[in-house]
């Protein structure tokens, strides 16, 4: 009986390894209007904190801004459901600057091109499934 249990458990090890395997999320961010500041990327795996509580993101990335298109590979991301919130932080103050009525002064975007009616989209609207070994997201920065 013990031998049968050991054989069964050992047959599950490859499956268990695959579900916890780290993989790469390839990002292509386009539409940046200049080289000022940084692009801030927050990756969330639940609606908790999405999109503005970056301290609750599973990964936070800061890369130099580059007009046009930026390609970036997020390494070691466990397969699962995620949503991205991205800001072109032109003045490097680590937040999205807004003006009258909360209208953004800096560029921003969300995964799947999601947009809210009056404010940011929900996690569900922006979420996508990241699968091993790699997946990709194309994102377009928007300015008002």
Explain the meaning of each model-derived region.
Residues 62-68, 130-132:
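Short proline/glycine- and polar residue-rich coil/turn motifs
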